[in-house]
Amino acid sequence: MSIMLKKWNELAEVKAELAARDWFFATSGNLSLKVTDAPLTFLVTASGKDKRKQTSEDFLLIDADGKPVEDTHLKPSAETLLHVEVYRRTNAGCVLHVHTVDNNIISDVYAQNREAVFSGQEIIKAFGIWEENAEVRIPIIDNYADIPTLANEFAKHIDGDTGAVLIQNHGITVWGRDAFEAKKHLEAWEFLFSWQVKRLLLQRAAVPLVD
């Protein structure tokens, strides 16, 4: 099996798993998986596709400038430049971006803080943090309509081979050294977002909570 086909199948599997969670509302979201380092190439989801379906045109191969390697009628996802920034600056192998109701709520509620902070949850161990009552933070950036501007702002928060950024009312982007790690971190963040949204609702309803 060629490296290209292997990577295609791997990304298709991730897409299917996230689609099963219904995380691709109205064709939103984008995914990518690095294929080669030198030169940099990666597979990225094609723009405007229903990601709940599996087709032969789900992905296209992209270069270090965010351009298709071969002539194609397909267009790469709108936020492909964000993926480029991650691959240029780190050794990450996979980037995942999804819009969910919970991550949009969290990005809106904590927008003025420029970050959301979570602590005391067992799921934080998914990030490799094992301290008791550990804390994790995720930056929140403004949602710029101009993608190069958005990519420049996003790039300020890329500081390792794994990471995550919330874009206000525009979903979460997570990256990891491989698809398994990126998906694991995405699932952990979404768990924390869902937990916090429900916690805020209970607090508003004046339901006693145990800290």
Swiss-Prot record:
Record text on cofactor binding: Binds 1 zinc ion per subunit.
Primary role: Catalyzes the dehydration of methylthioribulose-1-phosphate (MTRu-1-P) into 2,3-diketo-5-methylthiopentyl-1-phosphate (DK-MTP-1-P).
Family recorded in the similarity comment: Belongs to the aldolase class II family. MtnB subfamily.
InterPro entries xref list: Aldolase_II/adducin_N, Aldolase_II/adducin_N_sf, MethylthioRu-1-P_deHdtase_MtnB
Phylogenetic classification of the source organism: Bacteria, Bacillati, Bacillota, Bacilli, Bacillales
Keyword annotations: Amino-acid biosynthesis, Lyase, Metal-binding, Methionine biosynthesis, Zinc
Protein's recorded name: Methylthioribulose-1-phosphate dehydratase
Organism: Geobacillus thermodenitrificans (strain NG80-2)
Record pathway: Amino-acid biosynthesis; L-methionine biosynthesis via salvage pathway; L-methionine from S-methyl-5-thio-alpha-D-ribose 1-phosphate: step 2/6
MF GO annotations: methylthioribulose 1-phosphate dehydratase activity; zinc ion binding
SUBUNIT field: Homotetramer.
SUPFAM superfamilies, alphabetized: AraD/HMP-PK domain-like (SSF53639)
Residues bound to Zn(2+): H97, H99
Assigned EC number: 4.2.1.109
Catalytic activity: 5-(methylsulfanyl)-D-ribulose 1-phosphate = 5-methylsulfanyl-2,3-dioxopentyl phosphate + H2O
